[in-house]
């Protein structure tokens, strides 16, 4: 049907001898030119190809055409009609109904009389739109009186029926002020019906200020208050239910007059007698005998400001003017892309409104009940007769402070007297707990002094050991006693090693793995009288202080270089714990039994000192908590909130005999 130069069908058998170059090239279209470098569309009857520019059809418009026939074929055979593609229905049974429903002259699907969408619109509308919708929704129930129409009016009705098949997205020109508007006014009847403005969402129409001024239905457009004293929905006639025998001719004549005077429909409606604009009663399908064609003309938006439909040419009506169609489709696509973002904006706007209402409620509490001041309770302040503020029991802060002061003066003396008369068991328990904490603190301080003494003794032993002389005979005896065939495995890396160098290897392997982990705190350690505890080296990247023991930190300290003539100096022991008073006099580089013995002894003493300091800190925290509880127990707030009831006034001491 459609295509460009590559989609052209081969010429007939009679043209095989013709060359495509020069004068013998095949010619196409009504212009009879051989040009094939532009968009072309082919007739599905005569297989003739036409240029889109010559017949005013663009490539985008051709995508919506299913079957296209040229004008000559349509004049020869009136049964040939251009058919268009339609979107699939979103309902589950849309595909089943599409094949069974009849199609109209333009190839579109006809709306049945019982279409639920039509019934919904007819049920929710008001005025003439609701009357016409109800009348056309059930033509089999009513017997409408035929209207006398001239041939020109009959042709006009056919045009309006074709206009009704145009998609609703084509009701936007994209140029007027209403089409360019992006926000709803929030004041018209359509906006008040929306959920985001607190409505029931029954009408489901766009804001009246956003209805296109050229293509929208006249009943949906915005009518300024200066032109009409009533709203657009109220301007349309709302007749009462007429009797079935007498009012039917008048009803059809009235609608016939509206049909003839389409251009001035609103002015004629305003001049209706008072009976036509009275309060309407519920209408049924049997009550109204209306012309379905009149309803189609009304829904298609045929009543514009000039009394003429916005599409007058019957051949251009199915696919619109190319420029206007392009703008309308562009606006539609932009709206589809912004659909999700608009939903998010609406949700965000709802949350913002809720938060704003909550803030206004607390910032301006007097606004909540300003309409009904008599419903506010009286202020509870002493001697105050004013109304309390919304959300409060008092009219001002002064009244609340006065009442609180009176309560203290009235209740506190009696509570103090009760506290002094009966001893408090919790107070006595607190005193006992304080005594126990103080004893533990004293023992911890004694332990800390002992560890300080051991610290200084160790430093003296290390200093005296360094003064010993090296003996070579002990080195030879050690080498002879070692077993070279025995192997053990490292506890850190698992490699097999010789027992002679096991301690040296394990110490270095441990330092390598330990340096991969950091232990830090945000604050340095400050302990009075304590030396050489934590490393406390600041790390600028993590902004922490290292909390390893200073003598064992492999990350920020290294073992000093040992000279060749330095003695080992490790104190020798008997039966593991009993000191002999002698020292190891092997060279420090060659002694494998006492590798880094100074560092390990210092770490042992420092670790014990740290434990004692932690114990002291815990005891200080317990003492502070107990003292705080004892202070608050007899305070103003505690006495006002808590009370011990003595059921026997003669017995003031409530303790048991065991606790006394």
Curated annotation (Swiss-Prot):
Biased composition (Acidic residues): 1-14
Top-level taxon of the source organism: Eukaryota
Cross-link Glycyl lysine isopeptide (Lys-Gly) (interchain with G-Cter in SUMO2) per UniProt, renumbered positions: 254
Residue numbers of N-acetylmethionine PTMs: 1
Phosphoserine sites (modified residues): 6, 19, 124, 228
InterPro entries for the chain: CpG-bd_C, Spp1/CFP1, Zinc_finger_PHD-type_CS, Znf_CXXC, Znf_FYVE_PHD, Znf_PHD, Znf_PHD-finger, Znf_RING/FYVE/PHD
Basic residues biased stretches: 328-338, 350-362
Residue numbers bearing the Phosphothreonine modification: 231
Segments of skewed composition (Basic and acidic residues): 91-120, 339-349, 363-372
UniProt keyword annotation of DNA-binding present: yes
Keywords, sorted A to Z: Acetylation, Activator, Coiled coil, DNA-binding, Isopeptide bond, Metal-binding, Nucleus, Phosphoprotein, Transcription, Transcription regulation, Ubl conjugation, Zinc, Zinc-finger
UniProt-annotated binding residues for Zn(2+) 1: 173, 176, 179, 212
Pfam families linked to this entry: CpG_bind_C, PHD, zf-CXXC
GO CC, any one term: nuclear speck
List of residues binding Zn(2+) 2: 185, 188, 191, 207
Zn finger limits (CXXC-type): 164-213
Subunit structure, interactors included: Component of the SET1 complex, at least composed of the catalytic subunit (SETD1A or SETD1B), WDR5, WDR82, RBBP5, ASH2L/ASH2, CXXC1/CFP1, HCFC1 and DPY30. Interacts with SETD1A. Interacts with ZNF335. Interacts with PRDM9; this interaction does not link PRDM9-activated recombination hotspot sites with DSB machinery and is not required for the hotspot recognition pathway. Interacts with histone H3K4me3.
Name assigned to this protein: CXXC-type zinc finger protein 1
Organism: Mus musculus (Mouse)
């Amino acid at each position: 049907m459609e295509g460009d130069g590559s989609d052209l069908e081969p010429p007939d058998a009679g043209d095989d001898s013709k060359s495509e170059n020069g004068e013998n090239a095949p010619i196409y279209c009504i212009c009879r030119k051989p040009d094939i470098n532009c968009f072309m569309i082919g007739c599905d009857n005569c297989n003739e190809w036409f240029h889109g520019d010559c017949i005013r059809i663009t490539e985008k418009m051709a995508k919506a055409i299913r079957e296209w026939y040229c004008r000559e074929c349509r004049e020869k055979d009136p049964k040939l009609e251009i058919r268009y593609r339609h979107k699939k229905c979103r309902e589950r049974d849309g595909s089943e109904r599409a094949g069974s429903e009849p199609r109209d002259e333009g190839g579109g699907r006809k709306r049945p009389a019982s279409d639920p969408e039509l019934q919904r619109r007819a049920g929710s509308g008001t005025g003439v739109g609701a009357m016409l919708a109800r009348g056309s929704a059930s033509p089999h129930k009513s017997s409408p009186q035929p209207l006398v129409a001239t041939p020109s009016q009959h042709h006009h009705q056919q045009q309006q029926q074709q206009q009704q098949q145009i998609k609703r997205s084509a009701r936007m020109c994209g140029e007027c002020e209403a089409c360019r508007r992006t926000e709803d006014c929030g004041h018209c009847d359509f906006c008040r019906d929306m959920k985001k403005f607190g409505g029931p969402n029954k009408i489901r129409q766009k804001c009246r200020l956003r209805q296109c001024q050229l293509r929208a239905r006249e009943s949906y457009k915005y009518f300024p208050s200066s032109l009409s004293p009533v709203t657009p929905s109220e301007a349309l006639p709302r007749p009462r239910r007429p009797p079935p025998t007498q009012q039917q001719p008048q009803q059809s004549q009235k609608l016939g007059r509206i049909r003839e005077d389409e251009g001035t429909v609103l002015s004629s409606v305003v001049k209706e007698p008072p009976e036509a604009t009275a309060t309407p009663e519920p209408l049924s399908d049997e009550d109204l005998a209306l012309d379905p064609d009149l309803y189609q003309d009304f829904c298609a938006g045929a009543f514009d400001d000039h009394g003429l439909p916005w599409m007058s040419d019957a051949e251009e009506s199915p696919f619109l003017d190319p420029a206007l169609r392009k703008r309308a489709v562009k606006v539609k696509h932009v709206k589809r892309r912004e659909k999700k973002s608009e939903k998010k904006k609406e949700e965000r706007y709802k949350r913002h409104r809720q938060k704003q209402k909550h803030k206004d409620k607390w910032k301006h509490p007097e606004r909540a009940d300003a309409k009904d001041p008599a419903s506010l309770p009286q202020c509870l302040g002493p001697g105050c007769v004013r109304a309390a503020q919304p959300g409060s029991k008092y009219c001002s802060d002064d009244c609340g402070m006065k009442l609180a002061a009176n309560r203290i003066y009235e209740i506190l003396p009696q509570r103090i007297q009760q506290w002094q008369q009966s001893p408090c068991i919790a107070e006595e328990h607190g005193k006992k707990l304080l005594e126990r904490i103080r004893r533990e603190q004293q023992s911890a301080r004694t332990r800390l002094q002992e560890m300080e003494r051991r610290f200084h003794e160790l430093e003296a032993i290390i200093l005296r050991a360094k003064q010993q002389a090296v003996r070579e005979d002990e080195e030879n005896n050690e080498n002879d006693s070692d077993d070279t065939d025995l192997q053990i495995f490292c506890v850190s890396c698992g490699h097999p090693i010789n027992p002679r160098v096991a301690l040296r290897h394990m110490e270095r392997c441990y330092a390598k793995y330990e340096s991969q982990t950091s232990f830090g705190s945000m604050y340095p350690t400050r302990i009075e009288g304590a030396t050489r505890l934590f490393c406390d080296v600041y790390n600028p990247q993590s902004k922490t202080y290292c909390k390893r023991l200073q003598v064992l930190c492999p990350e920020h300290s290294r073992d000093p270089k040992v000279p060749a003539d330095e003695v080992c100096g490790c104190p020798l022991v008997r039966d593991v714990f009993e000191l002999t008073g002698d020292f190891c006099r092997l060279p420090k580089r060659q002694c494998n039994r006492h590798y880094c013995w100074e560092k390990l002894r210092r770490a042992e003493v420092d670790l014990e000192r740290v434990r004692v300091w932690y114990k002291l800190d815990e005891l200080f925290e317990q003492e502070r908590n107990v003292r705080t509880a004892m202070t608050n127990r007899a305070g103003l707030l505690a006495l006002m909130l808590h009370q011990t009831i003595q059921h026997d006034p003669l017995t003031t001491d409530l303790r048991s005999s065991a606790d006394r």
